[in-house]
Amino acid sequence: IQRTGELLGIEVIKLANALHASGDNTSFKMRTDSLQFSTRADKNRKVNVHIATFLINDFAIAVCPGEMFVQLQLEWKAKARLADVTPLFFGYTYVKGRSPGYVADVRSAALGGFGAEGGNRIQVGGGEAIINKHLESLYILNDQRASIHLK
C-alpha cells in the first residue's frame, strides 16, 4: 500500500505540473434547483431533492445527494460533453433537505436488484428527471459562460 501511495503521488505531481490556466479570466457560474417527487412507497408523500450545477471555465460539475446509479452518471457525462465541457459528477453531496437514497434509472428499477428495489426513496423516473435538470442548468450556464469573470 505504501508503494501504491508513492506511485499515485508521483502521478498527481506530474498532472499538477502539466495543468495550465486557460487564460487571464476564470469564469464561475452556478444554479441550484429543487425537484419534488412522490415517494416510491406512497404516492401521496413528497420528497424534495436539492441539486446544484456548477460551470467553472470548461468544467461542469453536477452535485446531487444520494447515490445515483452509474447509468445516470454516464448519461450526464455523455450529454454534458455535447456542451464542449469536461463533466464531473458528485453524489452523496448535501445542498439542502434529505437524501433520496439510492436513485436507480428506469431500466434498473424495472430489473430490480440491490439498490433498485426497496432502497429507492423517490419515484421511478426520478433519476432521469434529476439528470435532465442538471443538463438544462448546464446548457443555461454554458450560454451565459462569459457573464461573470474573476481575475
Kindly give the residue locations of the regions a language model identified.
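Non-catalytic substrate/cofactor recognition surfaces at enzyme active-site rims
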Residues: 1-151
